[in-house]
C-alpha cells in the first residue's frame, strides 16, 4: 500500500521541515549527481517525528496483511525505527551488524533467532534495493524466512522490481512521485524542481535480474555520454567543446599543475609533457622571471602539442577589480590563458566582471565549487551556490574545480586537484585521492596533478602513468 491516508501529507511536510528532503545538486555514493538528497538520520533527535514515522511503517505492514514473527531494521538509519516499532507493539527484534565483531560472539545477527520464523525488514529509503537484499541474505543464512520489507520512501528507481525478483515484496509508505506531489501542493517546491527530479529518476533506473541472471523488463539507465559526444552538445561552451575533442583525440584527461618558479622549467615541462596532457595549469604569480614573451612561447607549445592553458588565478574580488586583474596589470592573463577560475564568495559580480573581458576573446571560466584541502569551507550550500551561478552564466562558465561531480549537466566540466596514484596527504592539509576514485567513482572529468609528476625522477614516465590511470578510469565509467 503506497499511502496511509490523511496522515501522509503532514508526515511528508514534517520530514521536509526538518530537512530530511533536500533539493539542489548532490553527489551520491555512486558518484552520480542527483537533484535530490534524502537523509532521515536526523529524526533520531526528534522523538515525536521518530514515533510518527515508526507508527506509519507499522500501520503499512498491518494494512498489507503481512504475517511475521520478528523485525529487523537495515543498518543504520532504520535501526531506531525498528526499535520503536518493536517496543511499542511488543514484537521481538533482531539487529543485523554491517560487519562481524572480532570479539565476543562474533555474530552478524544479534537477538533470539528461531530458524523457520519470518522476519520483516524495515528500511528508510529504497533506491536499488541492494541494502534490503543484503540484510535479507544475512537473515536467511540464519535460517529465517524473509518475504516482505516495509520502506518509508521508494525512490522508484528499480528497487521494488529487484526485490521482487528475489522473492521479497516491497511495501512503501510513500513513493518519491507522491512526495513531490505533496510538497508541490504545499508550495514547498516549485514545478521546475519537480520536473528535474522526475527526469533524473526516469533516466536512472537500476536494472533488476532474476535468479538465473536474465534481466527483467524495466528501463535501463542510459550510458554516460563520452567526451566526444559531450563536445557536440548544442549548448556546450566552445572552449569546453574544444577541450573535450582534444581529450578524446589524445586519450588524455590529465592536467599538469606546473607550479614552478622559473620560466625555463615551465617551458621545458610544457614541451616534454605536452603530448600527455590536455591542459597545463599555471600560477604565474610564483614565476620569478615572468614576461609576456614567456607566455607567447607557452602558447606556441600549447598549439604544437594540443593542450589548453589554465591560469589558476582564483579571482575573488568585486567585478570591477577582477576585470582589471584579468585584462591588465603585469600578467595580462586574458591575452594568453584559455581558462581561469574564480571563487563564488563575491557573488555573481565576479563572473560578470571576468566575462566582460573573456567573452570577446573566446575564453572560459571555472568556478571553485569544492577544494581538496582539509577544513575547506567550500561544501554544502556553498557548493550548491557555485552550481547555480554556473548555470546562470553558462555563456562564460564552462565547469567547476571540485572533488567530485557537482552538476548533472553534461555541458559542464569537472576538474579535480589533489590527485596521486596512492591516496594520502601532506603536512599542509592537502588531501590526495587516486585517479580511479576521482574519475571512476566520483564522476569528475579531469585530474589535476602537480607534485606527483614534477617531483618524480622521470617526469614523462610519471605523466604517462597518471594519464593512463585517469583514462582507464574514464573508460570504466563508460562501461568500455
Swiss-Prot record:
The modification Phosphoserine is found at residue 214. GO terms for molecular function: orotate phosphoribosyltransferase activity; orotidine-5'-phosphate decarboxylase activity. Pathway: Pyrimidine metabolism; UMP biosynthesis via de novo pathway; UMP from orotate: step 1/2; Pyrimidine metabolism; UMP biosynthesis via de novo pathway; UMP from orotate: step 2/2. The modification Phosphotyrosine is found at residue 37. It catalyses: orotidine 5'-phosphate + diphosphate = orotate + 5-phospho-alpha-D-ribose 1-diphosphate; orotidine 5'-phosphate + H(+) = UMP + CO2. Residues 2-214 are annotated as: OPRTase. InterPro entries: Aldolase_TIM (IPR013785), OMPdecase (IPR014732), OMPdecase_AS (IPR018089), OMPdeCOase_dom (IPR001754), OPRT (IPR023031), Or_phspho_trans_dom (IPR004467), PRibTrfase_dom (IPR000836), PRTase-like (IPR029057). Keywords: Acetylation, Decarboxylase, Glycosyltransferase, Lyase, Multifunctional enzyme, Phosphoprotein, Pyrimidine biosynthesis, Transferase. Its EC number is 2.4.2.10, 4.1.1.23. Orotidine 5'-phosphate binds at residues 257, 281, 314, 317, 321, 372, 430-432, 450-451. Residues 221-480 are annotated as: OMPdecase. Residues 215-220 are annotated as: Domain linker. HAMAP family: PyrE. Bifunctional enzyme catalyzing the last two steps of de novo pyrimidine biosynthesis, orotate phosphoribosyltransferase (OPRT), which converts orotate to orotidine-5'-monophosphate (OMP), and orotidine-5'-monophosphate decarboxylase (ODC), the terminal enzymatic reaction that decarboxylates OMP to uridine monophosphate (UMP). This is Uridine 5'-monophosphate synthase.
Amino acid at each position: 500500500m503506497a499511502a496511509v491516508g490523511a496522515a501522509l501529507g503532514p508526515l511528508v511536510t514534517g520530514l521536509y521541515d526538518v530537512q530530511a528532503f533536500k533539493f539542489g545538486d548532490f553527489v551520491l555514493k555512486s558518484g552520480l549527481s542527483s537533484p535530490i538528497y534524502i537523509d532521515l538520520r536526523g529524526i533520531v533527535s526528534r522523538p515525536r517525528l521518530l514515533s510518527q514515522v515508526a507508527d506509519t511503517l507499522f500501520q503499512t505492514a498491518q494494512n498489507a496483511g503481512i504475517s511475521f514473527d520478528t523485525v529487523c531494521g537495515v543498518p543504520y538509519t532504520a535501526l531506531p525505527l525498528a526499535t520503536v516499532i518493536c517496543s511499542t507493539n511488543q514484537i521481538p527484534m533482531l539487529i543485523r551488524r554491517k560487519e562481524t565483531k572480532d570479539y565476543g560472539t562474533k555474530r552478524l545477527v544479534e537477538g533470539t533467532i528461531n530458524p523457520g520464523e519470518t522476519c520483516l525488514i524495515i528500511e528508510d529509503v529504497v533506491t536499488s534495493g541492494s541494502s534490503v537484499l543484503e540484510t535479507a541474505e544475512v537473515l536467511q543464512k540464519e535460517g529465517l524466512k524473509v518475504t516482505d520489507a516495509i520502506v518509508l520512501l521508494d525512490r522508484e528507481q528499480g528497487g521494488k522490481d529487484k526485490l521482487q525478483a528475489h522473492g521479497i515484496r516491497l511495501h512503501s509508505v510513500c513513493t518519491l512521485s507522491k512526495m513531490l506531489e505533496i510538497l508541490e501542493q504545499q508550495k514547498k517546491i516549485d514545478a521546475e524542481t519537480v520536473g528535474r527530479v522526475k527526469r533524473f529518476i526516469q533516466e536512472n533506473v537500476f536494472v533488476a535480474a532474476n535468479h538465473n541472471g536474465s534481466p527483467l523488463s524495466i528501463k535501463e539507465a542510459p550510458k554516460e555520454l563520452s567526451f566526444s559526444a559531450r563536445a557536440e552538445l548544442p549548448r556546450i561552451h566552445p572552449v569546453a567543446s574544444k577541450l573535450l575533442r582534444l581529450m578524446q583525440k589524445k586519450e588524455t584527461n590529465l592536467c599538469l599543475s606546473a607550479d614552478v618558479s622559473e620560466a625555463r622549467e615551465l617551458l621545458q615541462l610544457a614541451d616534454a609533457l605536452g603530448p600527455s596532457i590536455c591542459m597545463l595549469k599555471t600560477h604565474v604569480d610564483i614565476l620569478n622571471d615572468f614576461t609576456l614573451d614567456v607566455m607567447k612561447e607557452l602558447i606556441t607549445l600549447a598549439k604544437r602539442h594540443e593542450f589548453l592553458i589554465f591560469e589558476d588565478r582564483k579571482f575573488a574580488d568585486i567585478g570591477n577589480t577582477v576585470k582589471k586583474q584579468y585584462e591588465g596589470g603585469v600578467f595580462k592573463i586574458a591575452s594568453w590563458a584559455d581558462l581561469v577560475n574564480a571563487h563564488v564568495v563575491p557573488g555573481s559580480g565576479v563572473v560578470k566582471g571576468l566575462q566582460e573581458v573573456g567573452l570577446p576573446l573566446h575564453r572560459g571560466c571555472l568556478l571553485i565549487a569544492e577544494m581538496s584541502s582539509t577544513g575547506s569551507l567550500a561544501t554544502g550550500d556553498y557548493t550548491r551556490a557555485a552550481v547555480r551561478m554556473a548555470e546562470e552564466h553558462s555563456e562564460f562558465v564552462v565547469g567547476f574545480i571540485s572533488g567530485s561531480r557537482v552538476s548533472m549537466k553534461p555541458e559542464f566540466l569537472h576538474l579535480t586537484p589533489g590527485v596521486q596514484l596512492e591516496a594520502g596527504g601532506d603536512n599542509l592539509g592537502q588531501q590526495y585521492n587516486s585517479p580511479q576514485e576521482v574519475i571512476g567513482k566520483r564522476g569528475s572529468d579531469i585530474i589535476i596533478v602537480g607534485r606527483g609528476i614534477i617531483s618524480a625522477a622521470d617526469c614523462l614516465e610519471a605523466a604517462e602513468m597518471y594519464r593512463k590511470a585517469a583514462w582507464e578510469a574514464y573508460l570504466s565509467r563508460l562501461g568500455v
